Structure formats: C-alpha cells, structure tokens
Amino acid sequence: MKFNDELILLLKARYPIIYINTIEEDRVEYIIRKHIKANLNRSIYSWDFVDGYTNNPNNEGFAKRNPLQALELIERLTSETPALFLLKDFNRFLTDISISRKLKNVSRILKLQPKTIIIIGSDFQIPKELQDLITVLQFNLPVENEITQELTRLVNSLNLTIDPSLFESLTRACQGLSLERIRRVLSKIIATHKTIDENSISILLSEKKQIISQTEILEYWSVNEKMGNIGGVDNLKDWLKKRKTSFTIQASNYGLPTPRGLLLIGIQGTGKSLTAKAIATEWQLPLLKLDVGRLFGGIVGESESRLRQMIDVAETLSPCILWIDEMDKAFSNNDSRGDSGTSNRVLATFISWLSEKTKPVFVVATANNVDLLPLEIIRKGRFDEIFFLDLPELEERKEIFKIHIQEFRPNSWKLFDYKKLAQLSESFSGAEIRQSIIEAMYQAFDQQREFTTDDICLALKQLIPLAQLENSQTLKLQSWASSGRIRLASSKRISIN
C-alpha cells in the first residue's frame, strides 16, 4: 500500500497518534498538505519546539519551547473541528513522564473526534508504555518514478537536453538520496559545470557514499575483485553464474523470484569476503557492507532503529549487494553483549525482512563458526543457498598460487613450480597462501633480488596455518559440512584427517 493511501486509511479509522519515521520532514509535510487535506478537508496545525505553532493565525507562536502546552492546545480545540496536528521532532519528548501521561489523556479524546496527532521524526524510539497508542509509518526515500519526476522537472526548468541513457544513469545514481539532497547536489553541479553530463554521475555517487557513511552502520565499498581471483569453489561459481542476470526485467518476465541471498560458512581465509566483493563486481551492483559492531552499539533502542535504517537505505539503493561479514558474531547464540533481548529483536526483524523482502537486495552473509549461528538463520528458506568453503585441495592450491603470483609478477609467473608449492601448503587457506608469497617477496626484496619458488617454500615452512592451530574446530566444521547439511562450494570431496 502506498504511503498516501495508508495514511488516509489510518486517519479515516481515527487512529489517535501516528508516528512518521523519516529524514524528509519537508517532503512529508508537502504530501500531507497536498493530498491528505484534499481528501479529508482537515485544518492543519504545525508545531516545532523553537517556533511553536505556525500556519494558523489564531495560534501563531503558541507553545514555543513548551511541548506540554502544545498538547494542551489540542485538548482545548472544539470537538467539531477536524484537524491534523503535525508535531515535529516530538519523539524527543516522549520519555518525559508529563508528556507521556498527557498523550495518554489526549488520545482518549482523539478517538472520539476527527483529530489526529502526527509526530514527524527520524529517531525511532517509542517508550514501551506508549507503543499501543502510537502507530508507526515508515516514509521511505524517493523511489525511481519520484526521482524521474524530479529530474524531469529540473531538466525542463533549465531547458537542458539529456540523452535517455544518461538520464537513466542519473536516476540510478540518485537512488538512496532524499529529494532535498538531489536538488542540492544537482544545483551545485549546474553552478559549477553549467550543465548535467557524465561527470555528474561521479559527483552524485560521491554524495551517496557520504550519505551511506552517515548511517554509521553501512559502508559503500568500491570493488574490482573478480571471480577469476578466487581459486577453486567451482560449485559456488557455477551457482552465481546462473544468477548473474537474476535482477533483470527478462528474469522477472520469465517468472523468476527475486533472489534473497547467500550464506557462506567456512574456515577463516577461504575466500568468503572475497566472494562478496567479486559478486558485486561481476553483477555490476553497488556493494554495501554492514558494520555489525556499530549495529549493536549506542543506547538502548538504537540497534532496532539502525537496522530499520539499514534496510531502508539498502532497499532504496536496490538492486545492490548487502554484505554482512562474520554474521556468527552479530547474532551469536552466546551473546556477550549482555542484552539478549535487543539481539533477539534485531534478529527477528532481520529474518522477517530477509524472508519477505521484495526489493532486489542480495544479501551475502559470512560466518566462521556454525555453532554460534541461531537455527533461525540456517533454516531452509532464509537464504537461497548455504555454501561451505573448505580448505583448498591440491589442485585448488595450485590455482590459488597461480592467481596471486600472476598478480604480483604478470610477466614471469610461469617460472614457478606450482606443484611443489601446492604439495608444501597442505592445510593452508587461500589467504595464508597469499601471505606466504608476500613473505617470500619481503625476503627477496631485502636481498635485492627476485623472489623464487624456494623463497615461498621457506615462507610456507615458517608459517603455521590456522587450521593446525585450531585443529579440533576445523575438524568439527568439516565433519558438520560433510554430513550433507550444507552445499559444498567445491566439487572436491572434503577430506577429514
């Protein structure tokens, strides 16, 4: 249901208090004044802490710096006066005992009258005692058709001519920005360059990165990793290849559902994070990384608010890749943060969104320890598929050595003995293989010569792989994966030593 329709429905049903969660205060007020007033013919009273009531000559400036007095005016107005009361940032006062008590008293009156309080704010926290009284509406960032309308208006007002393909690219680049931000950035572009062209897209993307960083929990990653940079995992590569065009119109017309995502479980250093980056590159989609530590940081109630903000931004930027690294630490069964209630609520919200989402946000989650993952996460249907990434076998290690040495020495990579290197690197992960090459390079650089196979062999003998240091955990994970509960990323058999 569209926001306008849902809000009108709540107003007709005489819901007493509605909270609109948004960062676009002006856009919400514009919609209310244009659409809601036309449909319901209600007087609109607008209040904020600094200016008090505005837009109504009889009460101009009333209740300045006094939120309790703002509620008293609502009580005093005659019952025959159909009205909407827009209380901006009023959510900041809800924890005050006098405000919460007054809201409870006022809500009983509002149920019998054509009056409604609409709280507009961006900090979504409602005290428990008011949750039954307040109905929450999420006002999302502008969608594609709204952005298209705004860009068309701007282009026409400036008498500009823009190629259709550039216009489409501009529309995509604006996704995830508020209308106010879009207007501001485009005004800056026109003031600087006197036109809108291909260079405008990079400026918009830079603005988008700044916006995403301001969420505090999402990071926009610029990536150039490719599937060819990952050795082995042929089953996983084949699965991803078949879904490369899953977000296209052709796939939708064919009847294919939008893919939900992928959970990668495995030993550290086996390429789980690298896979997330490679998917974004191969599918040519933006990559957003969730900062799990900040998700659960801050004061009580912020985690749920931040998760909803993350979902809103990701869906607005869709199609995109949402990368959740080390999910086992985020939603651990052995939660050490001391607030299992918060963790459970965040987990429930995330799982609900993952199961029901319709926007093309492809989630790539990684985990090292399956024992820490709640059963709700690994249950069938949450993700499209769950893959296990094991330590590379002999042939896969040869491939990994070739990939990394070719990166460092594109002209002389054929001079190395890959069979010997693969034989000496049993139990090494892909990340540890790369590290052995770097160690060999440091050794040779110190002696002012080129590094060789022997240098890498020496580095391998000096490095102790994590799989040996944590042998019992590695064997346990391999045993779990070999039991058939999970799909193997590689067609090579798991060998449990």
UniProtKB/Swiss-Prot annotation:
Listed CDD domains: RecA-like_Ycf46-like (cd19507)
InterPro entries, alphabetized: AAA+_ATPase, AAA_domain_protein, ATPase_AAA_core, P-loop_NTPase
Organism: Trieres chinensis (Marine centric diatom)
Binding site for ATP: G266, I267, Q268, G269, T270, G271, K272, S273
Gene3D superfamilies (UniProt xref): 1.10.8.60, P-loop containing nucleotide triphosphate hydrolases
Taxonomic superkingdom: Eukaryota
Keyword Metal-binding: no
Protein keywords: ATP-binding, Chloroplast, Nucleotide-binding, Plastid
Pfam families in the cross-refs: AAA
Molecular function via GO: ATP binding; ATP hydrolysis activity
Gene: ycf46
Annotated GO CC locations: chloroplast
Family stated for the protein in its record: Belongs to the AAA ATPase family. Highly divergent.
Protein name per Swiss-Prot or TrEMBL: Uncharacterized AAA domain-containing protein ycf46
Cell location: Plastid, Chloroplast
